[in-house]
């Protein structure tokens, strides 16, 4: 469901720049509510047409919103990176690489000035140009992760395993528990970067120590 208006906090706001920085050492971050364009789907991202459709639609509408702002004299913003939330009904689907069972929400965070009305206009323009194949699945929504840990992975996506294991280990060592979907922020474009140079922030929302069941 799209919110009635803008939600405080987005990747377009300077005070959130820290959310898009990470190092090889896992660190805790406090993530405010973020307004996002989202498309939900399922299946192998490398072979499922719906995945490519989702990504193409997100970029088309996000850049359309930026150009609309520029056209009316507003200061344009930089379009944020592609992000993905990943989960499966059976968590073992990730351990066994059973990609057909993967579920995902691809998203791009939007500035606070973006409203549902603006999104509708940008989407209509993208549809008219044939650039929004996932138009019926696009929605403006709020991502509310709260406390999380994140780490930078450098290298191919299919080599993230040790980085994720290290992140989960750091979370457990500090008394937190995993909560919510696995979150990836793609700082590198696989179409333009060698696999070994891809940079991905891996974020995991957590449950506070005092809320973790004991014994």
Language model features with spans:
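A solvent-exposed interaction/effector surface
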Residues: 1-215
């Amino acid at each position: 469901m799209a919110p009635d208006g803008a939600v405080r906090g987005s990747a377009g706001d300077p005070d959130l720049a820290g959310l898009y920085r990470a190092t090889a050492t896992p660190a805790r971050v406090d993530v405010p509510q973020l307004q996002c364009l989202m498309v939900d789907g399922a299946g192998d991202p490398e072979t499922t047409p719906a995945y490519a459709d989702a990504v193409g639609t997100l970029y088309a509408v996000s850049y359309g919103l930026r150009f609309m702002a520029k056209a009316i004299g507003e200061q344009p913003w930089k379009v944020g990176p592609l992000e993905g939330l990943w989960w499966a009904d059976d968590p073992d689907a990730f351990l066994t690489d059973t990609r057909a069972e993967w579920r995902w929400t691809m998203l791009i965070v939007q500035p606070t000035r973006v409203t549902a009305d603006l999104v509708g206009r940008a989407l209509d323009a993208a549809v008219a140009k044939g650039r929004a194949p996932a138009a019926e699945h696009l929605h403006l929504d709020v991502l509310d992760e709260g406390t999380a840990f994140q780490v930078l992975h450098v290298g191919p996506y299919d080599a993230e395993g040790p980085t994720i294991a290290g992140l989960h280990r750091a979370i457990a060592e500090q008394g937190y528990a995993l909560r919510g979907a696995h979150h990836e922020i793609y700082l590198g474009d696989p179409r333009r970067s060698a696999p070994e140079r891809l940079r991905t922030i891996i974020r995991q929302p957590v449950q506070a120590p005092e809320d973790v069941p004991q014994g």
